Regions:
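Phosphate/nucleotide-binding catalytic core
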Residues: 1-208
Length: 208
């Protein structure tokens, strides 16, 4: 987080982060580091499906994002203000706002993305490469096939539905979907129910 904070403030040329959230009440304040994002605790659901279904599953995750927010909303208050039903969404989107994307995309590093994926999830990694400046300029040593630098760069782009690359125990790359829209808690039962709902809807849609 120290490195992330340094780079965000560098990309902002030292200007403070400005937060403006309007809801039932309004909140306006400035902050001089990225740690406001720590107030946006979420339930991050990771789903891995066979590769032949990964693109369809990703698009389905986008489709059910609004119902998931409606189902899981659990963060109406911030600093004593009654804002959105899920106030962590605007909070997180503004907590790492560097305004460095091309005009074509028009999205920040925390966003809903640019729409459905037409061919495969490679489209999203090409967007990462072509339209998002490197935030953590750290060249990781080792075998390029370990995809360390790709994973590091992807980890600094926080789509609400994000493709993730990792290596399995045999060193083979694998893809999974990280669904980030759900709020944390408030109870273990809620977390389990929300996770099962998301996974069940996706798997059900894949069988249609």
């Amino acid at each position: 987080y120290r490195a992330l904070n340094e780079q965000v403030m560098r990309m902002r040329q030292g200007t403070p982060l400005v937060f403006e959230i309007g809801g039932n009440e309004s909140l306006h304040f400035c902050h001089h580091d990225v740690m406001m994002e720590a107030a946006g605790t979420s339930l991050q659901i990771h789903l891995q499906v066979p590769y032949r279904h990964i693109t369809a599953a990703f698009n389905h995750a986008i489709r059910i994002s609004a119902p998931m927010v409606a189902l899981c909303a659990n963060a109406p208050y911030l600093f004593g203000k009654d804002l959105w039903a899920e106030s962590r969404i605007p909070l997180f989107e503004q907590a790492i706002n560097v305004n460095q994307l091309s005009h074509r995309l028009g999205e920040g590093r925390v966003s809903f993305g640019t729409g459905y994926t037409r061919e495969n999830l490679l489209d999203l990694f090409q967007e990462n490469r072509d339209h998002y400046p490197i935030m953590l300029p750290i060249c990781q040593p080792g075998d390029p096939q370990q995809l360390t630098n790709l994973m590091l760069h992807n980890g600094t782009i926080w789509r609400w539905n994000r493709p993730l690359v990792s290596l399995d125990t045999s060193g083979k790359p694998q893809l999974r979907i990280e669904h980030r829209v759900a709020s944390a808690g408030p109870t273990l039962e809620d977390i389990i129910a929300n996770t099962v709902f998301f996974s069940g809807v996706i798997m059900g849609m894949l069988t249609q």
